[in-house]
Amino acid sequence: MLLSSSSHIKNLQTDYDVIIIGSGAGGLSAAVPLAQAGLKVLVCEQHEVPGGWTHSFALQGYRFSPGVHYIGDLHEGGFLRNVYEGLGVSDDLEFCELNPDGYDHILIGQDRFDFPKGKANLVSRLQKHFPHEAQGIAAYMDTVSSMMENLDSMRRIKSIGGALNTISKGAGLVRWTWRSGKDLIDRFVSDPLLRGILSGQSGDHGLPPSMVSSFVHAGITYHYFNGGYYPRGGGGAIPNAFVRAFKKAGGKLRLKTAVAHILLNRNKAVGVELADGSKLTTKYIISNADPEVTFGQLIGRNNLSKKLRRRLDRLQYSVSALSLFFAVDMDLRAAGFDSGNYWLYDHADIDKIYRLGLTDYILKNKIPSALFLTVTTLKDPGKMRKGHHTCEAFTFVGYNAFRKWAHEKSGERSADYQSLKDKIAENMLKALNKRFPGIRDSVVFKNLGTPLTNEHYIKATRGSLYGIAKTRRQVGPGAFPIRSEIEGLYLCGASTLSHGVAGATFTGLLAAKSILQCRISDMLKTGGRSLVIHPAEDLSYWQKKGK
């Protein structure tokens, strides 16, 4: 596919038309349509595998995916599904649908609530559990829908009349611009347990509900209204499918290729210098790295405006995590597990729990007060190894808790660092065993990642999970724009308009759209097969497939 609008790019002589720094969901979703439009595109990835947070890795034969646990918006007609099919990546990408009766299980103390697929089903179940809050539950969910649908309408505005119509519909939503997720919940319901349940997915943005933007909170709830999905083959299946489409269109990917500097001519980005000292020229650069890496390291503060320097100095990055990757010799389905995710909380004050997660409390030999657990071999039943289940558990921690070891080389850190990791892993397993007796004694393999692991492999500032923190002042008008103040330099990824696989993918499309000077729909015409969705919970289905 060659867009006529790409002709304006081809009259300058450079090594590449576009160089993309980083192969995360944002970088690759920009790379594919640009290459399909006939541009000469290079993606530089510092890691040995593509994907950024969407990559997978193997340890002792067990496959893990640190950043992809479930994805929404893959129902028929969903935007992300349309992207995968429109770019042709659906030819090499399949998903498994998580338990439609509970893609997220929220466990608070001794109480449990399962989030079912479908907004109406969710409202009905919540009202059944909390009949005294029935009216507030309905109003809350309707407000969540209105907030997201009006945001989507604003993106589609094509006329003054359309703008006025959207503004009139969304006038009542302006009140939420500077409000938090907690404000949104508390406006409609008062039951402490219900408030905790509605805050139960806060790990998808990593902030206390009182700190996160109401629109980010609402967006996560809305994103999963039509269920949760997991890529067959693990998170790495997503970048692998994008890379195949990218190379098919003539794009070039260089792994283990770190960019050391973005080259400027006055205030225009003209190329990159790689870590080996070689230089490449280009007409455009798209950075999938976070703002500190892009501006602070690759460009340098001295080359930035005072306004941008001040902004970098004030930035808050999202929380980091302790990531426990482990395998168990235990029949987890017989023990009551299914393909849904498990959010474990000691009590219903979710705000207090997430505030603790911003600190170093867990280093003081504490049992985590919150955990996220997922069993990837129940999400994707085709990936069992030796009859063992692979599991991933996460709890939040502030980066400063591990700062003292940051100067030590990865893989060669001191004995006290490894000893601390072992202690934390044991405490996480103790916490899981309290909820699920027997799981701790069934562990046959375990490995713990820390914020320093994230910093090394993902190049994430402060080991952040979601780029910049999605506070009220750092989203919307406060987010980093796709087009930077440096001419020819574009941004994508979690620190721009949105995070997560779907959010980052959207930002990559916006970057490509800006360069091609077209509409997003113009870039989604390659046409792949209809996305294949497998039912994770249908055991007879997997038996027939011989898996």
Identify the function of each model-found stretch:
Residues 109-212:
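Rossmann-like flavin
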Residues 68, 494-515:
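A conserved FAD-binding loop/helix module that cradles the flavin
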Residues 230, 260-385:
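Mid-domain catalytic core of redox enzymes
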Residues 191-208, 368-374, 429-498:
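A glycine-rich dinucleotide-binding beta-alpha-beta segment and adjacent secondary-structure elements
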Residues 219-273:
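Helical element adjacent to the flavin cofactor pocket in flavoenzyme catalytic cores
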Residues 1-18, 36-37, 471-475, 523-547:
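Extreme N-terminal leader/targeting segments of oxidoreductases
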Residues 6-146, 468-470:
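N-terminal glycine-rich phosphate/pyrophosphate-binding loop and immediately adjacent elements
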Residues 329-449:
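C-terminal segments that line or cap access tunnels to active or ligand-binding sites in enzymes
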